[in-house]
Amino acid sequence: MYCLQWLLPVLLIPKPLNPALWFSHSMFMGFYLLSFLLERKPCTICALVFLAALFLICYSCWGNCFLYHCTGSHLPESAHDPRIVGT
């Protein structure tokens, strides 16, 4: 389970508030995970545990899934403030 210490922190990286950055963030995370899986070749158990955690986070639709934005989840109120997000 040594390889999980490199995979689990990826789930804690927050998604940006600005919707314009969601695509680039998801592409970066996808390429990072793909390159990690190809280079490090984690054991089967670690890969299954990580994929199960990723599936549960994305299935729960709490807004932390980096693959897509759930339509039912709402953005924080600060996301609509132009002073914080910028133009």
From Swiss-Prot:
KW Repeat (keyword) present: no
Keyword rRNA-binding: no
Keywords from the UniProt entry: Apoptosis, Cell cycle, Cytoplasm, Membrane, Nucleus, Transmembrane, Transmembrane helix, Tumor suppressor
Location(s) in or outside the cell: Cytoplasm; Nucleus; Membrane
Transmembrane portions of the chain: 19-39, 43-63
Annotated membrane topology: Multi-pass membrane protein
Family affiliation: Belongs to the BLCAP family.
Assembly with partners or alone: Interacts with RB1 (phosphorylated and unphosphorylated). Interacts with STAT3; the interaction is promoted by cell stimulation with IL6 and phosphorylation of STAT3.
Name of the protein this chain belongs to: Apoptosis inducing factor BLCAP
Native source organism of the sequence: Didelphis virginiana
Primary gene name: BLCAP
